[in-house]
């Protein structure tokens, strides 16, 4: 029988519930337990696919093509289980499901209400997500409830968790509450009152936390922990100090040293073997003792909110771990390049253009790509970054003046990138769309496998085939591929059914690769990713060349 740990948050949002939940999962997995994680989002959107990155941050794409919360990326990076569509659901999905049942007559004429119909549906979704992992043999499912205790939006989720813990019975459910203990500079002390009130609010709705994770910018003294313990009715050893760390990969060890996993296992009636965090210790050692220092320029338009590129930033960190390199990521606004030029790129060891949507800032990205191509700077283009590399090459090398994407200029004289209208998904189902299709849920998404061209850099990196995740509407236009290849570009991977370009490279450049997919979604600190490791190795070589 699966046991559940519900993770809630109080006082303010953005305290790191996802990292806390993932770190706990990593410790439990190191103790031999089969663990999965779920994220419950209280917003009414069906998924975050059409939400602004400035509002939501990154959209993480799962293997089965779901557009989900960025916390699922943390989950996959911290544990071995893969996340799927069932691991993330929203208020919008819950209400959509309940209303569909009501229209079918499933409720037999009853008045449909938040309790019991919405809360029952939430519980069913939670159980379904837990059962989907480990062939139904999940030992522990950690359920992160989005939002902050006290918000109206998350009340149905909290009530569902309360009901579920009651139904499951003793030693089958536990509650972990993450809260803030702010330091007030003018008073020169930490304040515990917000945490006391947050726990009080939680207890008012019938939830009594087994464990408090108290976030602060510094370790919390024992006397302050004792005060929190007394006023929240949580044992002192279960009031955990979680201070700011310079790497999220230090959090599992921080929690384990304070006995978090023992407290959770005791609450769940589990007696697994001791934790083995040697892998995490090795990762931290590699982070703290690099042999190289590199500056990678990430040129985008969401650079004011780096959460928009969370998986990508972490993938570069992972590559740094596996090449013993300290990676300094410099986020560069592409619109700034349009006004100030490319001189600001001269100090970079490599340049990366990530995925994105819309016309704004694209000419600045194209200018950065041209700089990388003409100056031998290692370049990695992901999704839009590959499309723009093709546009830049078409304009300045292949002689296709005015080349563009129909996303930015529908009447471009040379539409080297265009909307794909028909393709086959990972299950073999034919999908169709046109310019009038809904934006939500209509992209080519999820993992797809394709063969790699022999003798290319792509083959040296991936081997004979590549299996990566996608999230895009536009593709390189096959009509122009012969002209691009004549000018020196190599299309090094194509989809097996539609023959669409998946990878491009320039063989006469030290390292210039574009990929239509999103490799950052499969990078982990444990294994890194061969594409990012190759990119960072090229950056190391470029740095050495500049220093010589």
From Swiss-Prot:
Q: Where does UTP bind?
A: 13, 191-196, 227
Keyword terms? ATP-binding, Glutamine amidotransferase, Ligase, Magnesium, Metal-binding, Nucleotide-binding, Pyrimidine biosynthesis
Its BP terms in the Gene Ontology are:
'de novo' CTP biosynthetic process; pyrimidine nucleobase biosynthetic process
Residue limits of the Glutamine amidotransferase type-1 domain? 295-545
Binding positions for Mg(2+) per the UniProt entry: 71, 144
Activity regulation text = Allosterically activated by GTP, when glutamine is the substrate; GTP has no effect on the reaction when ammonia is the substrate. The allosteric effector GTP functions by stabilizing the protein conformation that binds the tetrahedral intermediate(s) formed during glutamine hydrolysis. Inhibited by the product CTP, via allosteric rather than competitive inhibition.
Spell out the GO cellular component terms annotated for this protein, sorted alphabetically and separated by semicolons.
cytosol
Pathway it works in: Pyrimidine metabolism; CTP biosynthesis via de novo pathway; CTP from UDP: step 2/2
GO molecular function terms here?
A: ATP binding; CTP synthase activity; glutaminase activity; identical protein binding; metal ion binding
User: What reaction(s) does this enzyme catalyze?
Assistant: UTP + L-glutamine + ATP + H2O = CTP + L-glutamate + ADP + phosphate + 2 H(+); L-glutamine + H2O = L-glutamate + NH4(+); UTP + NH4(+) + ATP = CTP + ADP + phosphate + 2 H(+)
Query: Per its UniProt record, what SUPFAM superfamilies does this chain match?
Result: Class I glutamine amidotransferase-like (SSF52317), P-loop containing nucleoside triphosphate hydrolases (SSF52540)
The active site lies at 383, 518, 520
Which annotated residues bind ATP? 14-19, 71
Query: What positions does the entry give for L-glutamine binding?
Result: 356, 384-387, 407, 473
What EC class is this? ligase
Q: What is its EC number?
A: 6.3.4.2
Q: Which InterPro entries match?
A: Class_I_gatase-like (IPR029062), CTP_synthase (IPR004468), CTP_synthase_N (IPR017456), GATASE (IPR017926), GATase1_CTP_Synthase (IPR033828), P-loop_NTPase (IPR027417)
Residues where CTP binds = 13, 151-153, 191-196, 227
Residues of the region (Amidoligase domain) are 1-270
Oligomeric and partner information: Homotetramer.
What does the function comment of this entry state?
Catalyzes the ATP-dependent amination of UTP to CTP with either L-glutamine or ammonia as the source of nitrogen. Regulates intracellular CTP levels through interactions with the four ribonucleotide triphosphates.
Q: Which family does it belong to?
A: Belongs to the CTP synthase family.
Record-linked PANTHER family: CTP SYNTHASE (PTHR11550), CTP SYNTHASE-RELATED (PTHR11550:SF0)
Comment field (misc): CTPSs have evolved a hybrid strategy for distinguishing between UTP and CTP. The overlapping regions of the product feedback inhibitory and substrate sites recognize a common feature in both compounds, the triphosphate moiety. To differentiate isosteric substrate and product pyrimidine rings, an additional pocket far from the expected kinase/ligase catalytic site, specifically recognizes the cytosine and ribose portions of the product inhibitor.
Q: What is this protein called?
A: CTP synthase
Q: Which organism is it from?
A: Bordetella petrii (strain ATCC BAA-461 / DSM 12804 / CCUG 43448)
Gene from which the chain derives: pyrG
